Amino acid sequence: MSVRKYGAAYQGSKSKIANDIISLLPARKYLIDAFSGGGALAHCALESGKFEHIIANDLQTKEILEAHFLWTPEQHLDFQKKWIAKEEFEKTDSLYIKTCWSFSNNRKAYIYSKDCYEYKRLLHNAICFRNYKEFEDYCGIDLSEIDSYDNLNERRKAARRAILKALKPYSFKEPINSNTHIPKEIYDAILGGNKDWRNLQSIEATKQGKGLVSIISSENLERTKYSKNVESLIQQENLLRSKSITASNISITSVSYDEIDLPDPSETVIICDPPYRNTQGYQIEFDNDKFEQWCIDKAKEGYEVFVCEYNIKNPAFEEVWSKKVINTGGGNKNQKRSIEKLYHVK
């Protein structure tokens, strides 16, 4: 069962739990998403119909929010087709490029390693520009069968099927857990540009349990970056447009949370997903004590204030919801389990 994705690909996104959170907020004329990040909560709120207007604010991610909510489908398509080389990634000041083309959207490390860079570049060109011959000359896999598809997303899916079909004669199931594997020798040869990889008869030797790569791990051969990054953007863009969501429904601002121009308290709900206390990885220093006092002050003024956090000890914050989640930043090997909580300021 596929999970609905909200917002742009962004480290720390609330996409998986956006529905849970938005469903608990009272309906008002305005929703203030004070730390919008990739816009997952704002996106979900737009589709919920509970709010007439949403202000998506973030001190750092205005460029990402504008791309996600305000770009046309044509702009998204152009961005999908553009290959960003490592050199350009390292030089650019574009936060959007840094996010979409970085490993686990961390905006630091380029998405592809040296070992698979050329393979990924040629796969991208085959899918986006129909340069099948260059890809086949590099790794010996013919993708011309995807030519009948015009939709870019369908072409990616067809390319994945074609690559898996090419690998099938050289894969086998492990007796113990029935996981499907291919020999690592073949995996490395394809990424490295050895188009004669089919002549590497190492399957029998690797059946003994050495030098295996599971088909799940070998998705590096099948996938371009779009699985978690740009691919979701075009789908979300089309969904937004289909609901006639326009600039009249959402405003994007880029100020500190305590500088947001707030509407009347009786008409406004504030949702905050700030940098969590005692966690690392944020680009700026954040004063959690100051933030919590601001929330208390706003609640005293009559605003409905909700905060996402792992744990808030201040008694003014009442826990109203919690859920165990799995964070997969950095891939399946780096899964971390945590309990997300939503607090309401009394």
Where are these regions (language model features)?
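S-adenosyl-L-methionine
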Residues: 1-48
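Long, positively charged, glycine-interspersed low-complexity recognition regions
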Residues: 12-15, 277-278, 284-346
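Active-site regions of enzymes building and remodeling cell-envelope glycoconjugates
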Residues: 32, 51-54, 71-75, 267-269, ...
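Short, hydrophobic beta-strand segments that form beta-sheet elements in well-ordered domains
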Residues: 33, 54-56, 304-309
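Class I S-adenosyl-L-methionine-dependent methyltransferase module
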Residues: 48, 52-248
